[in-house]
């Protein structure tokens, strides 16, 4: 009885995996792989490679020790913290921890 139940569950899961279709909204992003099933394509899209964390140039870099990086950098004390601001290169903006 249990073997029959397990067989029917496995058969239904296999049937459902064959019926899985790519969603139309993501069909352009997924592309077409000739040997891969649609479920494998979705899984490969979700399990992508490592995400690069880029330092935004608009925000401040938070550091314990701040220093001037070029001759145009200047230091300002605001709200009890020291900030380094730069007119020529906004990547030089720093904030004290």
Swiss-Prot record:
Pfam families: Ribosomal_L36. One of its GO terms (cellular component) is mitochondrial large ribosomal subunit. SUPFAM superfamilies: Ribosomal protein L36. GO terms for molecular function: structural constituent of ribosome. The keyword Acetylation does not apply. Belongs to the bacterial ribosomal protein bL36 family. This is Large ribosomal subunit protein bL36m. It comes from Rattus norvegicus (Rat).
């Amino acid at each position: 009885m249990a073997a029959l139940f397990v067989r029917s569950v496995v058969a239904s899961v296999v049937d459902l995996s064959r019926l899985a279709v790519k969603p139309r909204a993501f069909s352009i992003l997924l592309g077409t792989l000739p040997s891969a099933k649609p479920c494998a394509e979705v899984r490969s899209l979700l399990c992508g490679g490592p995400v690069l964390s880029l330092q935004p140039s608009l925000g401040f870099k938070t550091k314990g020790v701040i220093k001037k990086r070029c001759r145009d950098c200047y230091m300002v004390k605001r709200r009890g913290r020291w900030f380094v601001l730069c007119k020529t290169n906004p990547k030089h903006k720093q904030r004290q921890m």
